[in-house]
Amino acid sequence: MSESVRTNTSIWSKGMLSVIVAQFLSAFGDNALLFATLALLKAQFYPDWSQPVLQMVFVGAYILFAPFVGQIADSFAKGRVMMVANGLKLAGAAGICLGVNPFVGYTLVGIGAAAYSPAKYGILGELTTGDKLVKANGLMEASTIAAILLGSVAGGVLADWHVIAALVACALAYAGAVAANLFIPKLVAARPGQSWRLSAMTRSFFSACVVLWRNGETRFSLVGTGLFWGAGVTLRFLLVLWVPVALGITDNATPTYLNAMVAVGIVVGAGAAAKLVTLETVSRCMPAGILIGVVVAIFSLQHALLPAYALLLLIGMLGGFFVVPLNALLQERGKKSVGAGNAIAVQNLGENSAMLLMLGLYSLAVLVGVPAVAIGIGFGVLFALAIAALWIWQRRQASY
């Protein structure tokens, strides 16, 4: 490791700021590209059920490459891994701009995102240490939330003006992320010299899966975070379908504004969880998870914009309070058992598998003609029941 990295572990170091800027631009591009590509599908008269399929090809890339991306992140300098991953995202977005099938281009973006995730979190521990690492994670999450808010809104607003302009803006964001990655110090690979045989890599990954699943706390965390993020991405697409039906608004911007309210709420809920929940009292977050489903069902019955905003803000607050303690639990327990990189890769597999399942069920419901309001109510009720079942299961496991 270079001397500059050894001595400068400040969260305001050049390397750390480069990581944060790259993360913001990359996440901005991800969120803007989703809504810009959805607008492109609408403009090209794709059926409604194809919208969640777009996200399914994205998360499918995460699942397919899950056994390998953790080792890739640990075998090379993580800053360079992030740069190559953002380059793949840039190629996918540029391809969509140039007329490549949007599903093909978005799959390439998904491959880049899969490779990017373990590297972006793993590099924080190489650039700083101790209490500063907690603050660095906070900066990373803050930049991500800001990118979700601004990227989602920018994608929808620009798409209402000009779809191709929105897609070009996404490509430029990814290009900026690649440029920012160039300023990250070239760190020594964490675990060089590992076997690149597919069978060995796959065995190593699934061995980590088994270790985490056999531990009651990490299993509880994996299921909880998987349910949450699966529900979260499904809600995004439900809003795109629900807004014109319930509110009579047909633009591309309104669903992005509503999604932004959820992101704002997550920030508030995450702050509350940091103050009120510890690793020893993680079960305090479970009532919030049940209430997410209840509020989603109530939200689905609304016909005015103001209560819709308020309820989505509440959903976000409940979500932040629910998921942050579960993430912390998995990171802490996983670091001690299989390593942080493997724990993140396994969590990504679980979350994206849940997304794929929920999006598949949602696509099927849309395909057979279930009304958007009915989908929302059923979705909320099922989510509340699933979290309640998880809570009961966790309490029984703890009593043994």
Swiss-Prot record:
Keywords: Cell inner membrane, Cell membrane, Lipid transport, Membrane, Transmembrane, Transmembrane helix, Transport
Pfam families: MFS_1 (PF07690)
CDD domains hit by this protein: MFS_MefA_like
GO cellular component terms attached to this protein's record: plasma membrane
Record's bilayer topology term: Multi-pass membrane protein
Coarse class of the protein's main subcellular location: membrane
Family: Belongs to the major facilitator superfamily. LplT (TC 2.A.1.42) family.
Name of the protein this chain belongs to: Lysophospholipid transporter LplT
Any one GO molecular-function label of the UniProt entry: lysophospholipid:sodium symporter activity
